[in-house]
Amino acid sequence: CLMPWSTAYGNVMLGVKNVYPHASRAERSQIVESALSSVGLADSMEKYPREMSGGMQQRVGIARAIALKPKLLLLDEPFGRLDSLTRMELQDVMLDILNREQITTMLVSHDVDEVVFLCDRVVMMTNGPAATIGEILTIDFERPRDRSTMLQDPLYFRCLDHLVSFLT
């Protein structure tokens, strides 16, 4: 959730100030600008959330997270509110950032295409309030991943079929 009274730059800086309190103003500014540039928002740093599309707002959230250089990043349905094209574009951006920054990520998602594209392992949960781990599926695609190459590989569809059959 973005702070509506703050620009994209300010929203990212909010966390950076707290995580890097001893960094100089110039160093913190460089961290923020680099994070926003990495998600394609170099020209939108001074925009407020009300001036941004849902996809742009999601990019600011991603920039805010990666600017903090976490060892573990938890993403809970990060692309759920987005249209299909924006979702795919942001998945590509996210995958590029995670590969480059080497951030371990735990992704919660109900989108089987998304988990096959982004994840190395899928932990499938059983139904119900007392849910447990039902099965773990390893996704054996090389990194860096390319969506068009994966879509031509029979392994991609075997993984999808396996996930869907577990869910049904």
Q: Model segments located where?
A:
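Conserved ABC ATPase "signature" region
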Residues: 13, 17-20, 24-44, 96
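Catalytic Walker B motif of ABC-type/P-loop ATPase nucleotide-binding domains
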Residues: 73-76
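Conserved H-loop
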Residues: 102-108
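Short coil-to-helix segment of the ABC ATPase nucleotide-binding domain corresponding to the Q-loop/switch region
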Residues: 6-15, 116
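Signature (C-motif/LSGGQ) region and adjacent switch/coupling loops
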Residues: 9, 45-48
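Conserved signature/switch motifs of ABC ATPase nucleotide-binding domains
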Residues: 47-50, 68
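Hydrophobic anchor residue at the start of the ABC signature
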Residues: 62
